[in-house]
Amino acid sequence: MGIIELKNIVKTFPSEKVGEGVHAVKNVSLSIEEGDIFGIIGYSGAGKSTLVRCINLLESPTSGEVLVEGKNITAYSEAQLRAVRRRMGMIFQHFNLLNSANVFENVAAPLKNQRRFTKDEIEEKRAELRKDSSLSEKEIKEKEKALLKSNKKLSGKEIKERVEEMLRLTGLEDKARAYPSQLSGGQKQRVAIARALVGKPKILLCDEATSALDPNTTTQIIELLRSLQEKLKLTVVMITHQMEVVKSICNKVAVMEDGKVIEEGSLVEVFSEPKSSTTKEFREKTLYRKEALALTEKNRRNLYELTFIGEKANDPAIMELVRTYPVEVSILFGNIEILSGVPFGTLTIDMKGEGKDILDAVAYLKSREIKVEELGGHRIEGFSGEENDSCRGQNPEYYKNTERSEEVKIDDELREEDKIWNG
């Protein structure tokens, strides 16, 4: 069982214009394992942000179950949910910092009135004591009493130590007394990350955390999140519409469209063998498919995309191909990267020669366990070269009903963060 289990989650928002309401999430089931960096990707209006808010019950599902560490939290009281939310950090697209507070005070904010242990942690520690066969019943009771007595609010010293640790981990040691107005966008997001993790959560939820950042800063934040995930043993859920973000950090991914999960699996599986048109669109945005198709339309070339996974990324197949078969091969585009620790390479080639020789060459490549896909050329019947609508699959009614100004979105996020910290 995963650390997070979503079972048949449905979320419907009431709407005066739509009689049955707006179905933002439709019967979604997902299992997220401990230690995963799980990406949920989709276009605007796909339902991904609503889904992630169902994980910590900032949005209560209309139906379905949310299990965290095996416990169905949809049945929890508000008091129980407060304890659960403290074990789930969350960062948003907007940084939501307190402008009148410095960096240290912003990071320390969630620790106000926090005790050393949650009720669940107390129960876990009591269970560990009772499993210790070396302790007598009297000793167990004495230790339980001492445990409960020690569960006081965090002292000023403890808060200071925690905040300083998070500032060090996020590279903000020299910014403790700075105010938000003195920080760059990337530094503000680092403060938000430190604040989300200062309570020592096991789970970090990221809702479009890099969308407001430039590419260089996005890369830095992704590297920071990866480092923190390893050091703090976090389970991370990444909500994004950016395939580059998913490729850079996630080991698993789910693709959402119109409130449904249409595809999921390991990053390598989903990226190398996309099944849905939406997933293919996301994939093509990170390759040179558009440029290759333009060349095909202009010059009627025989273009092929070759995919190399794992050890095959080092395979000298092209060199051996031209030595063995009477064909000419031109490499138009090429790329190799590491996806979740696995080498993943693509080549777009133009192949010239007699029809039979080209077919034999393609068969040879496939025999080397290289995926070969025709992109276009005079041998492909019915090829139109038309590009798909980049927004296909969105739920326009949902997007229209949930479209808000940036100011209102920020207000919503502030309320949600207050709910996480204070219930």
What is each stretch, according to the model?
Residues 19, 73-89, 113, 154-161, ...:
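ABC ATPase NBD coupling module
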